[in-house]
A protein has these predicted regions:
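Intrinsically disordered, low-complexity, basic-enriched segments
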Residues: 1-80
Length: 80
């Protein structure tokens, strides 16, 4: 999938949860990405985040930082 599409999707998910407040929106976005995104999609967007994350909204950026931290802790649980 194209990087532009992944950035768009992450931002859209963040906007969906945005009415819950920034902290809850980031948590909801991270949870969605961990549960429903293919591992290859997560790897691609996390590499983009590592390279600066151009185009990512603040909620999506915070959510992806959480996904990144979760993958470092328990990578086997993200694929379930």
């Amino acid at each position: 999938m194209s990087l532009d599409k992944l950035v768009y999707m992450a931002n859209q998910i963040g906007k969906f949860f945005d009415s819950q407040g920034r902290e809850q929106a980031a948590a909801g976005t991270a949870d969605h990405i961990k549960k429903f995104w293919d591992p290859r999609m997560r790897a691609q967007i996390l590499a983009h985040l590592q390279a600066g994350g151009e185009g990512l909204d603040p909620v999506a950026r915070t959510a992806l930082e959480r996904v990144k931290a979760a993958e470092k802790r328990k990578p086997e649980q993200l694929n379930n």
